[in-house]
Every structure is written in structure tokens, then in C-alpha cells.
Amino acid sequence: MKLIVAVDSNWGIGLRNALLVHIPSDMKFFRSETMGKTIIMGRKTLESFPGGQPLKNRVNVVLTTDKNYKVKDTVIVHTIEEMLDELKKYDSEDIFVIGGESIYRQMLPYCDVAHVTKIDHAYEADAYFPDLDSDPEWEITADSDEQVYFDITYQFLKYERKKA
């Protein structure tokens, strides 16, 4: 299982249920990596999408504790155990965790690859991703050249869980 996330220099990922910044090439990378795949998210992440609707051309799996929550064209699960059971139906190489904060934290132990867009700026944030740089289980295995979008410098990084 993989995850995909954009973080600032403090590993911030969001503020008031929105991304910290919108970078077109990051959005394009997200689309290219997740199109036709299974994506895992929490309810608040789904509700942050335009119209609160699932992303097209992907299997959208949403974790929520609300037993009455229903959204067309989504698979709704209510526990991590139920999610893991549901995910057995899909190729683990084609599953991406896409947020938010609590879903990332709960699913990180099941992930072996993390695609991280690292933004060289500290934004105001109220949601964070675990700092993989300080986690001895993870290492950077690929990185892009630094990119610039207006005054924003960023880089695409691939982290992999170290083999035991």
C-alpha cells in the first residue's frame, strides 16, 4: 500500500479542512498516480472535494464513524478492520492513502511507499503528517530536482519503508 501527500517544511498538510497550497504540477502528479486506482480517505477529506463528491475514475473508500453516512459511488467503512477487509479485494500496489491527518496516522503502518511533495515553506496549519525524515523506518529512495511555482519551491520525494 502507498500513500500520497503534500507537506510543508513542518510536515503540515492542511488548515481548516483545506490544502495549504495548490500547486498545479502536484495536482497533476496526484492525478497520474491515483487514476484508475483505489484511494482511501476520511470523511472530511471527501467533503473537501468539489461538491463533496468522490474523485472520478478511482475506487473511493471512505472511513467514517457515522453509521448513516452515504455518498454515491463510494465504499463506506466504519473501522480500520473493516477497511483492511475491504482492501483485500484490490491489488495492494494500486491502493493509495490520501488523507487526512487521522487516516494517514492510522494507515501509515500498512504502507511501504510514501510519495511526498515537500514544500520549502512553513504555512499556518492545523493538520500534520508524521515526520518521515526523523522516522528510522523510512528512507528517501528517489527525489526530483527542486521545482518552482511562483515563489513556492518544492520537490517530489519517494520514501520507502526500510526492509527489516
Locate predicted features.
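Enzymes that bind and transform nitrogen-containing heteroaromatic metabolites
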Residues: M1-A164
